[in-house]
Design a protein with these regions (language model features):
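Conserved phosphate/anionic-ligand binding catalytic regions in large, soluble enzymes, centered on
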Residues: 163-180
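Long, Pro/Ser/Thr-rich low-complexity/intrinsically disordered regulatory tracts in eukaryotic proteins
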Residues: 1-161, 176, 190, 195-197, ...
């Protein structure tokens, strides 16, 4: 299972079963922070507690399979190379924070990677459930299945007044972080994204880049997530975030039509230039690749550029990341110039199909 996860550009859950109309929403994610009752939190770095949590996680494979019918595997991070761990971060299957802490850290992963449980990160467990497109409710329902299967065998640290107890006070309560990853090229291109982000933050939500906190919104890809976990139910959190995202989708569509109406030829020029560069360039760095791939996806959505596969944008975003690229090519000793050359070649091959 590990080889499949590391070698495949897209996890099975991220592939679209039906034709997406405008590829604005890339994916939905639910994350539940949980700690076991009676054990010191991970940030205390208590070896005995870390060992116990690790042992509990290794015994979860059969109960989880019974809960949702998927096969589960346990992946010890200590047994992975640095580049393999970096690929898991690039694929959003592991947090950068977990990559930095190795002893007693592991992942419990479903066969389609729609469920990933990070063990001994900031909390004992971070249960992550993912789905393609805007499917927060589906992702949440799956997370609850897993959550209940674990809690049925190993009680969580829970307080009647405060809710689920977590290492960081900002997660206390529901322990729920719901997030949606969106591709917003027209809002970015028009400059309207700055004002929109300000409005979203004022409503109590966070806006981050492709790789979460502190990351840049490369390729016009943004993550929108809730911040409040106390005084609000899980259902209300999901309902409110869904409404926020639906509003963002409407604004992106409006911006696309505005760009077409105000200067269609200018827009076509930008999109065709990006297409031309990636069709013929011999070296492309990661940032330029994402920027121009974003332009091409917008051009495909607006029927300005030739159509490409329904998952091509997501595949190329994954393949052109530096760590996955070296894994994809089977060579971890590539120079930066080598990476830029191979990145350009991979993109040219995709565009020629």
């Amino acid at each position: 299972m590990l080889d499949t996860i590391l070698d495949s550009p897209l996890s099975q859950w991220l592939r679209h079963d039906t034709e997406a109309t405008d590829h604005i929403v890339i994916s939905s994610r639910i994350r539940l922070a949980r700690n076991f009752n009676g054990l010191l939190f991970t940030n205390r770095n208590d070896t005995s507690a870390l060992e116990k949590v690790n042992a509990i996680s290794r015994g979860l494979l059969q109960p989880l399979k019974a809960a949702d019918g998927h096969q589960y595997s346990n992946i010890s991070l200590e047994q992975l190379s640095q580049s393999e761990r970096a690929v898991l971060v690039e694929k959003h299957l592991m947090s950068p924070a977990l990559e930095e802490k190795l002893p007693y850290r592991n992942l419990v992963v479903s066969d389609d990677a729609s469920i990933v449980i990070m063990v001994n990160e900031e909390d004992h467990l971070r249960i992550q459930s993912m789905a393609s497109g805007l499917q927060l409710q589906q992702a949440y329902d799956h997370a609850v299945q897993i959550d209940k299967a674990i809690e049925g065998k190993h009680p969580y640290a829970f307080d009647e007044r405060f809710g689920y107890l977590t290492a960081c006070p900002t997660n206390v309560g529901t322990g729920l972080r719901a997030s949606v990853m969106l591709h917003l090229p027209a809002l970015t291109m028009s400059g309207r994204i700055t004002r929109l982000i300000r409005s979203i933050i004022q409503l109590g939500y966070s806006v981050r880049g492709l790789y979460g906190e502190g990351s840049e919104a490369l390729g016009a890809i943004y993550q929108i997530s809730n911040q409040r976990t106390m005084g609000i139910s899980e259902e209300a959190t999901i309902e409110q975030l869904t409404k926020i995202v639906e509003g963002i989708i409407a604004e992106e569509r409006k911006s696309r039509q505005s760009l077409l109406h105000n200067d269609k030829e200018g827009l076509e020029d930008v999109l065709w230039r990006s297409y031309g560069v990636l069709q013929y360039a011999r070296r492309v760095n990661g940032k330029e690749a994402l920027t121009k791939l974003s332009d091409i996806q917008l051009g495909v959505d607006l029927d300005i550029l030739p159509p490409w596969g329904n998952d091509t944008f997501n595949e190329l975003v994954a393949i052109t990341r530096p760590n996955f690229l070296t894994k994809y090519l089977g060579n971890e000793d590539l120079t930066e110039a080598d990476c830029d050359s191979y990145r350009a070649k991979v993109i040219r091959q995709k565009l020629s199909k």
